[in-house]
Amino acid sequence: MEQFQVYLELNRSRRHDFLYPLIFRESIYALAHGHGLNKSMIFFENQGYGNKFSSLIVKRLILRMDQQKRLISSANDSNQNPVFGHNNNLYSQMVAAGFAVIVEIPFSLRLISYSQGAEVAKSHNLQSIHSIFPFLEDKLSHLNYVLEALIPHPIHLEILVQALRYWVKDASSLHLLRFSLYEYCNLKSFITPKKSISIFNPRLFLFLYNSHACEYEFIFLFLRNQSSHLRSTSSGVFLERIFFYGKIKYLGEVFYNDFQNNLWLFKDPFIHFIRYQGKSILASKDTSLLINKWKYYFVDLWQYYFYLWSQSGRVRINQLSKYSLDFLGYLSSVRLNPSVVRSQMLENSFLIDNAMKTLDTRIPIISLIGSLSKAKFCNTLGHPISKPTWADSPDSDIIDRFVRICRNLSHYHSGSSKKKSLYRIKYILRFSCVKTLARKHKSTVRAFLKKLGSEFLEEFFTETEEEHAFSLIFPRGFFALRKFDRGRIWYLDIICIDALVNHS
């Protein structure tokens, strides 16, 4: 964020609401071409124009925009009177990239002020993805149902602009956004997977989608707080909203002023909500009747308030004891562990059956093999194949790449309850490495292994640094007795999901 303050010289109290003049600053496009707000934020570069993103073209773009008296035109007139001339595609993508950086400034300033005022702990251990699973072990095992709802996409671009106007108070910036959307996106297929991303700036696309999803989440969290005896705790930042309580009043009118009378049906202190990969996931201890009421509440909220057509079939309800939740690269489910206790009182003895609920985390082997298949490590059936694009590299680089991928997957999936699936992934990567090396040296796999020996690829199965540290602390018999290799280990240094794990 310090980069923004150096480049833009913003005054937090007065100037951050007027973002439109920043589109004429060269430093904005330099930040857009770099890494954005800070090094931790992911920036998606434009595939077709990365090599043309030069300072000369940026200056030419700013000069052309400054000379234009009418930047905003209707969608019908855009084809007849293009704003940017022959380089329409290039200039528009550059403007979209710059606007994607600009529109994040108010959020970043508020986030910094919130962190400074709340004195949020800056422990890196709390940022680990694995730190979520101990929480799930403690909470999810006591819940009964999980509700998964696919978030509907807006069918009209104006819905996106209307959702963003509560965050960005600069009307000129919104007009620029509206112009860009109508200029280069089809009204019916703007938010469709993998189509608009190649046309429009991916960073701006993700920002608009998150703004659209957060719009209904604020209302959901508000009603959830009103209907529960306990206050909800969020890991995010509740930012200031305009006309928020007016929206709640309007929502009550949509439900014919009877919604407040029915709030008692939703009283549930054991409820957890999260949004993940285009889905709203709600886990609850409610009965099947009450969880079905939440299902139709989601549908009504989307249809009557956001004017988005949705069907009840897009919302699925499953029992945690019979269903596995695909979350953060693990299949999580609640498993019953039966146990029998023998009790004796005087001369009478009897058996007590007791079942304890525990969280079972498994590797999604099918989806992970699908990711390996897309990356050309194996075929769709999981049979290892060679990696021809790496065959030109030195042998040490090829082995290092495969070993690094194998160790990263082993490190991330160390919390799996069953390690057999992980051994299968290691097998695929091991023989894919062998076939790649054999392809490079124009030999068969058998002849190549016979020439170099079986110890050639032992790095795939050597113990990790963590396992070596445990072996120094505990005696060797401890691992065999306790079956330590089957236990789950959650690490506190994993801050991102591997590309192969994040298959969707």
From Swiss-Prot:
Disulfide bonds: none annotated. InterPro entries: Domain_X, Maturase_MatK, Maturase_MatK_N. The keyword Plastid applies. GO terms for biological process: mRNA processing; RNA splicing; tRNA processing. Its main location: plastid. It is found in: Plastid, Chloroplast. It comes from the Eukaryota. GO terms for cellular component: chloroplast. The keyword tRNA processing applies. Keywords: Chloroplast, mRNA processing, Plastid, RNA-binding, tRNA processing. Usually encoded in the trnK tRNA gene intron. Probably assists in splicing its own and other chloroplast group II introns. Belongs to the intron maturase 2 family. MatK subfamily. This is Maturase K. The gene is matK.
